[in-house]
Amino acid sequence: KLIVSTDASGREINQGVEQYYEATQGNGIVLTIDEVIQSYAEKAAQRAYELNNAKRVKIIAMDPKTGDVLAMASKPDYDPNQPTKAIYPYFEELLDSYDDDKKINAYYEMWRNTLISDTYEPGSTFKLVTATSSVEENVIKPNEKFTCTGSVTVEGRRIKCWRSYRPHGSETFEQAVQNSCNPVFVELGKRLGVSRLYDYIEAFGLTSKTGIDLTGEANSILYKEKDVGPVELATISFGQSISVTPIQLITAVSSIANDGKLMQPRLVKAYTDNEGNITKEVEPKTVRQVVSKETSQKMLKVMESVVTDGGGKIAYLPGYRLGGKTGTAQKVIDGQYAQGKYICSFISV
């Protein structure tokens, strides 16, 4: 770089001081991103965006043992080489809607990493938190049967099962997870109580930022514990009345696949000098033990049954053992549930 003397108007002074600094090689970082997985995630997100005419599609892949982020994709996105040029109609319309002096607002919308900065109601994927907490706290009796009549009434409010038109009837805990049966999870939330459920929500990392090494991370939105009544407890139990970021949810569920250990998400695993030699390694960080290894193993079997026998059959891959949980939540707009607007998700291990 070149440093010169200027006057108050920014004009160079002829007899001023001039100093030149040679360019120096910068240091580097080694990311946890797997370029092959990232490529597949980008293509899958684009395909889902087009096929479903979605407003946004988001995908994260994480190694549950280390917290390493292996892929992170979101559509629509932008070209980093031309960051102010919209490459999707959605952003073109957004840019056109702003005056030149306010276009920065549209750019922020385009550049924002929604996987860490936006919250959403997780819907039934959150049932894994309620289910795992219930197993850990032994609030489910061995071989216990639950009954779904299509709805449950809490404090005078009727809460429907998604299949209220054809109730699930008698079902085990495992079948209730497979069926994503709301009334059963209302019952589990009641058995846990507000205090214990909130303890687990906190233990799973859903009340604080994950600490991922990216700027702009948002935190979850949920009721203060003292403000949670029977109705709020019921809806939180099956994933409503709580909003989390995608990175928070995948980190929480990854702990179930990691013998109950919650890891901090990691994006940088090493620093290098200008010749590529590693100067510092970033070790995986265990945040806490959330549940026991035994509970973790039980829940992995339950999650596997969702893919083999439940609502996640579409994710089944011959030759592989997969577990997961589907989720569908009504989109919240201006503080109200919007009719016909949904957030559909799937989380798997």
Regions found by a protein language model. Give the residues of each.
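Beta-lactam-recognizing serine transpeptidase/beta-lactamase-like catalytic domain environment
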Residues: 7-20, 24, 33, 65-125, ...
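Conserved, well-ordered alpha-helix/loop/beta-strand core segments that scaffold catalytic motifs
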Residues: 14-57
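Short hydrophobic alpha-helical segments used for membrane anchoring or interfacial signaling
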Residues: 59-64
